[in-house]
Amino acid sequence: MNTPGLWAGLGESIFLANIGERERSPTRLVGVLIGGLAVGIVAATCITCLTMIPLTLALGHGSEGIAGLGAAASALADPNRNDLTIQIGRLVVTTFVDDGLLLVFAAFAAAAMHRQLRIYATAAPRIRWRLVLVGLALATLALTPLVTAQRVLDGAPPLPILSVAPDLGGRVLYVAAALLLIPAAAVEELVFRGWLLRQIAAFNQRPLILIGLSAIIFAAAHFDFSPDAFLTRALMGAGLAYMTLRLGGIEFAVGAHAANNLLIVLFLQPLSVQSQSEPVSMFELITDAALLGGYFIATEAVVRWPWLRRLGDVRPAEISPPDNLTTEFG
């Protein structure tokens, strides 16, 4: 029996197994999109109110009631406010709200399809937590040269981790808040790689459609349509989709996604309420290509090096074909 090539093998990923008639029902899909987004928005609204209360108190507006909440929201949205309290507030509010919306959506989708939520995370018998750490470590190694090059190109501006506060205590608080980006990456992967890849596969399992469509939807969902940001997110989404299909779960992609976000807010720029629209430069194209290449190399390192597979708790049966170095790419 002929073994499919690397690209074709992605369509046979174990992560796409057991897709049934419920996933193939257009009516049920529309119901999931409408119902899941509705309950997700309700959850996000409630979480916004809850997370804004401590921020309002921290900014000294606690005695002003509803007006105080409005003042805190205005401070959070002010692009000229970048002090420690605001930066931590942006990280906390953004991650909690996004996590709430996406997690509720994924849970609604799983319930509508009569599935356990875990099916959107992994095809392995259990969540491979060590694979998350392997993804975090390898992606950090792959992305560090790109971050360094970006800093050199920008004229080596002050590191956010140092400039956000003058003292060690403030910097530690900032790092602690930035760590919320790890569960945030996990929830994003649960929806945009877990649920979305399986849902697309219910109608078409061709790798180009699976990876291309999920990458475009992932980029569009950030509502930042400036050419440079959209292209970067789309290529990042393609790389994360490749990881998920190749390794049979989102765990490695969670680590890679989290590493990307952490490196940005700690060493490039803090979380911002505004993004400047810029044309796609040659440097941007090179770094985007390097990002995608780094994701591919890191994934194949796990596939092809037995010690990395053992470290990440990856079994050969969970890898899409071809699953060994002697199989010719095709």
What is each of the regions a protein language model found here?
Residues M1-H114, Q276-G330:
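N-terminal, membrane-interfacial amphipathic/helix-forming hydrophobic leader that caps
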Residues A111-R130, I200-L213, P322-T326:
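Cytoplasmic juxtamembrane regions at transmembrane-helix boundaries
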Residues R171-N324:
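Transmembrane helix-loop-helix hairpins at the membrane interface
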